[in-house]
Regions:
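Short N-terminal targeting/anchoring amphipathic segment
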Residues: 69-70, 161-178
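Short acidic, S/G/P-rich loop/turn micro-motifs used as interaction or catalytic elements
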Residues: 74-79, 107-110, 150-153, 178-181, ...
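N-terminal subdomain of nucleotide-sugar transferases
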Residues: 1-124
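Conserved nucleotide-sugar phosphate-binding/catalytic loop shared by glycosyltransferases and other
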Residues: 114-153
């Protein structure tokens, strides 16, 4: 069944069901959860096979310990709670002396791969960021790139990889759950992923997952074999 869809279509399906689930418009059980995991994994595997020649690893000694690239699946205004969370994080990174590059990959409910599906939606994009190269939050200024929401994942990935090979960050911080671009970048450079909801682990293929709280006693066995960073 999954072989009937290409990578863009599979990722589109996964994103739409993520939205429906967040809005409590569908209920999932273990079987449907596992199906969604297979959909995401299949999409990732196809993308990886098509792009692996571009994903050459950047050795640690070539990367700048003071530089971090932050990828986010969506960046809107200050009334948008996930955007406020991201701003808090990048401001702290700057206080720690890091040079931070922010990239909005615009992957939140992207239109690429669109197929007929129940109640579809496309993620919002802040028009004022479209041609911006610098973004200011209060007194703090950051280098910035917003990738066109019309680009496919493969084109988004090429754009991010150009930046990464130019600035050579020590690592990538991916904010938001289910960033295919960040998951693929993790093949070239260490990538830590963090959900914008503090209490949840992000959905990611990358091994480094950040949890925005301490691990509870009853979770220790579940997380024992995961590389979970508490923050």
């Amino acid at each position: 069944l999954l072989g009937d869809f290409n990578a863009d279509e599979l990722y589109y399906i996964w994103n739409q069901f993520k939205r429906l689930s967040l809005k409590k418009m569908v209920q999932t059980d273990r079987e449907s959860y596992n199906l969604l995991e297979r959909i995401y994994r299949k999409s990732y595997d196809i993308y990886f096979e098509k792009t692996k020649s571009q994903l050459e690893k950047i050795p640690k000694e070539q990367r700048d310990p003071a530089c971090i690239v932050v990828l986010t699946i969506q960046l809107l205004g200050m009334n948008h709670a996930p955007t406020k969370t991201l701003i808090e994080r990048v401001k702290w990174l700057k206080k720690l002396g890091k040079k931070v590059y922010i990239v909005n990959t615009t992957e939140q409910y992207l239109a690429a791969g669109e197929i007929p599906i129940y109640d579809p939606a496309v993620g919002s994009v802040e028009e004022s960021y479209r041609n911006a190269h610098v973004i200011r939050f209060g007194e703090d200024e950051f280098d910035f790139l917003q990738i066109s929401e019309k680009m496919t994942i493969e084109r988004k990935l090429r754009t991010v990889l150009r930046l990464i090979r130019q600035v050579k960050p020590f690592y990538i911080l991916s904010m938001g759950t289910g960033s295919m671009t960040a998951d693929l970048c993790g093949q070239a450079i260490p990538t830590a992923s963090m959900a914008l909801a503090f209490s949840n682990l992000p959905h990611t293929m990358n091994p480094m997952k950040i949890l925005g709280r301490m691990i509870r006693e009853e979770e220790k066995e579940t997380f024992a074999n995961m590389d979970v960073i508490e923050s």
